Amino acid sequence: MLIVGGLIGVALIFDYINGFHDAANSIATVVSTRVLSPGKAVIWAAFFNFVAAFTFGTAVARTVGSGMIDINTVTFSVIFGGLTGAIIWDLITWYFGLPTSSSHALVGGYAGAAVAKTGFAAVVTGGWTKTIIFIFLSPLIGMTAGLTLMIAIHWLFRWTPPSRVDRWFRRLQLISAAFFSLNHGANDAQKTMGIIAGVLYTAHYIDTFYIPFWVVLIAYTAISLGTLAGGWRIIHTMGSKITKLQPVGGFAAETGAAIALLVATQTGVPVSTTHAITGAIVGVGATRRVSAVRWGVAGQIVWAWIFTIPAAFTIAAAAYALLRISGAQ
C-alpha cells in the first residue's frame, strides 16, 4: 500500500512539474503580446487545463500505460525508474530554460527502465512507431496551420486598419489561449494517468488496464496546480526569443498548435506540446520574412528535443540499475 501510494505521489509530482515546465507553452504567446499579465495568464491556462478532464477521453493514457511498453513486464522499480528519468531531465532543462518535451522525457524514461529490466523485448513497436511519426508530424502540423492562418488573416483583413485588427485579436487571443490550454491539458495529463493506471495494474488493484475516473481528476488537478506555478525562463524563450509576436501572430500560433494537439489526442498519440507550439511560432514568424525567425534559437531547441528521449532513457536505466543493486524488484 505504501509503495503504491508513493509511486502515485511521484507520478503526480511529475505531472505537477510537467505543468510548470510546459506552462510556458500555454501562455508564452499571450504574455509576450501583452494580452495578459503572467499572473492572469497562468490562472487562465490552469483553469482550461482542468476543464479538459470533462472534455476528452483517455486514449493517450491507454497508449502510454500499455501501448508502448509491455504492461506485463512492468514492476514498481520500472515505474519509479522511468519517473525518475523524466523528472530529472525536466528539471535540468527547466533550469537552463530549454523548452523540451516532458512527454518524450516520460516515454523515454519509462522505456529506459523497462529495457534495463528485460531488454528491448519490453518495447511495443506499434505504440512507438506512431509516437516517433508524430515527433516529426506535430511541429509540421503546427507550423503549417500557423502559417496558413497568418496568410488567411492578412488577406481577410488587408483593408482593415492595423490598430483595429490588433484590438480584435487581443480579444480573440484569449480564446486561442484557452483552446491551446484545453488541448495541452488533455494530452499531457493523460500521460500521467497512464502511469498511475500501470501502478494500479501492477499492484493488482485493477484486473484489466483501464483509467478510473478518480485518476483522471487527480492527474488534471496536479497539472493545473503546476501550471499555476509557471515557468518564466521558458516563457521568455518561447514568447520572444524565437520571433517577435503581435496579437494576430499569437492567435495564429496558439490555434495552429492546438490543432496539432487535437489531432494527436483524438488518435491516442502522446505528443509534445512544446514541438507543436514551437512549430506554429516558426510558421507565424516565417510569414513576415524568413529572417524574422531566430534560427539559432530554434536550432538550440531542436537539439534539446533530439537529446530528450535518449537522455531520459539513460537516466531512467541508471536509476533502475541502482534500485536493483539496492535489492528492489
Report each predicted region and the residues it spans:
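Multi-pass alpha-helical transmembrane bundle typical of ion/small-solute transporters
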Residues: M1-Q329
